[in-house]
């Protein structure tokens, strides 16, 4: 039986997708990345990586069959790498494949000068947690709940607060967007360059009142993920966040009909959980974040 650890290649996508699907179906095997359930989701996310996935992802192959997957996503401007996997086929567990894959993923992050690796494990994935902790990862923050929503199940908020309008942002909104981001997410790690790119792509939606930005949300078209729904402090508890999210979703689906979007939120953030459920978001899994300084 010949085992080979090698770089991910386009021909591995079907096998990796099957590993992702299997893990998602088993709470005791769930990880934060990948969350691919369709070939389209996999293609969309990997096609947008600035550093090609072939340079940062790996597979383990035995006798020509892909039995394991891991790696990192490294984006210029970010000081961290996002961990993918490790995922190992059930028939090949107990052979230290996950350990080898994780060590190789860490090495690839180091080679790209990442200062830390951020990963996540399903709250019931005891084996994955032990694997990360043995490699030096430590829990970070509280548990997060992951939700998904497709267009057909979206319950739109029909009426928003008076004088509030929602529109796609432009690069001219960078200063106001960064101000909101720093206020709402003081520990956030998204660099200004990422926000500028999102504004240029029309992926950032702005809620305005009396000519001032009062709320924002970022919908990443490649990841199909909703990031950073934020409302300035003196405008909270007025339904602004719910309306901005709803209008942003409607705007997104007008250009990307039928796509499914995801988001994550702290599992004990009851107001946010209620907001998302009211708009039709369905719970998918609960994750615990982990971090490894490099």
Language model features by range: what are they?
Residues 90-93, 119-129, 233, 262-273, ...:
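Conserved beta-strand-loop-alpha-helix junction that forms the acyl-donor binding cleft
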Residues 120-122, 138-152, 264, 282-294:
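Conserved catalytic-core motifs of GNAT/GCN5-like acyltransferases
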Residues 4-18, 164-177:
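A short beta-loop-alpha structural element at the N-terminal edge
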Residues 95, 99, 123-141, 242-243, ...:
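Conserved active-site alpha-helix within GNAT-family acetyltransferase domains
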Residues 88, 94-107, 134, 231, ...:
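Conserved acetyl-CoA-binding loop-helix of GNAT-fold acetyltransferases
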Residues 24-46, 178-201:
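Conserved GNAT-fold acetyl-CoA-binding loop/helix
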Residues 44-59, 68, 82, 196-206, ...:
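A short helix-loop-beta-strand connector motif used in the catalytic cores of GNAT acetyltransferases and
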Residues 109-123, 252-264:
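Conserved GNAT acetyl-CoA-binding A-motif
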């Amino acid at each position: 039986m010949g085992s080979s650890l090698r770089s991910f290649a386009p021909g591995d996508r079907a096998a990796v997708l099957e590993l992702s699907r299997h893990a998602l179906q088993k709470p005791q095997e769930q990880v934060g990345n990948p969350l691919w359930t369709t070939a389209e989701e996999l293609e969309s996310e990997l096609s947008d990586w600035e550093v090609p996935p072939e340079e940062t992802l790996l597979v383990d192959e035995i006798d020509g069959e892909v039995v394991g997957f891991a790696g990192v996503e490294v984006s210029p401007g970010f000081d961290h790498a996002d961990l993918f996997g490790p995922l190992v086929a059930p028939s090949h567990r107990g052979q230290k494949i996950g350990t080898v894959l994780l060590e190789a993923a860490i090495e690839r992050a180091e080679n790209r000068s990442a200062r830390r690796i951020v990963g996540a494990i399903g709250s019931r994935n005891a084996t994955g947690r032990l694997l990360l902790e043995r490699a030096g990862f430590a829990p970070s923050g509280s548990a997060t709940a992951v939700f998904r929503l497709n267009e057909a199940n979206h319950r739109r908020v029909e009426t928003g607060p008076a004088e509030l309008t929602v529109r796609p942002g432009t690069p001219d909104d960078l200063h106001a967007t960064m101000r909101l981001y720093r206020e709402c997410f003081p520990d956030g790690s998204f660099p200004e360059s990422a926000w500028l790119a999102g504004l240029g792509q029309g992926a950032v939606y702005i809620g305005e009142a009396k000519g001032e930005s009062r709320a924002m949300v970022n919908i990443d078209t490649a990841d199909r993920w909703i990031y950073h729904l934020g409302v300035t402090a003196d405008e909270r508890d007025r339904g602004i966040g719910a309306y901005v999210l709803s209008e942003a979703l409607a705007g997104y689906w007008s250009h990307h009909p039928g796509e499914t979007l995801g988001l994550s939120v702290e599992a004990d953030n009851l107001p946010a959980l209620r907001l998302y459920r009211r708009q039709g978001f369905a719970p998918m899994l609960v994750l615990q974040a982990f971090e490894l300084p490099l």
